[in-house]
Amino acid sequence: LKEIVRELYKKSDRIVISTNGFFTDRIIKLCEEFPNIGIRISIEGLEQTNNEIRGLNDGFNRGYSTLKKLVEMKHPDVGFGMTVQDKNAKDLVALYDLSNEMGMEFATASLHNSFYFVEAKNIIHDRPMVAQEFENLINKLLESKSPKKWFRAYFNHGLINYIYGQKRLLPCDMAFDTFFIDPYGDVMPCNGTKCKEVMGNLNKQSWDELWNSEKAEKVRNVVRHCSR
């Protein structure tokens, strides 16, 4: 990972790494060498809930310990987030409060299915309960004096729409402003689509050729009509 970051560091203004935070020492060493990288730690609830979902007995404590150490060393770009589902929705506001106390960013996502994770059975069953927990979070965010948190409130309002199968509030810019590259060089709009949508492969094409190709335009059309 260090070698990859070292190369990207030369070319990118911002690098953010998502992790479960389990290997604290490795993450700290990485941040010491690259002080401007962002770290986002995925925590799926309070201790019991997180450990059950993640299948790691000490997962919450390890992730939380990593967060605290990064704060103590005054790392400038730290945050955490959770993917909300029936099992952890009740912990949503508690985790937000925890992030607030530590002065961190708090990101949310909703449970979903994807070809990339070979999963098609992720379903939120108690939608009213989960929606209410999102509503509680929205009210908390709107109490803040931070405009960024007001925008996060709007985003979370959009997640309520999403879990009820309604039209998304914000347009998706995947394949237009952002993209996903898998380890084999395939460039895709994201890793959250139902089927694999490949714009091209960097081992076989130059970036300009790939990005401006007919195949890429076909994928963008798929994104325009994506209901996810």
Which residues are covered by each model-predicted region?
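Residue-level signal for short amphipathic helical patches enriched in basic/charged
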Residues: 18, 87, 154, 202, ...
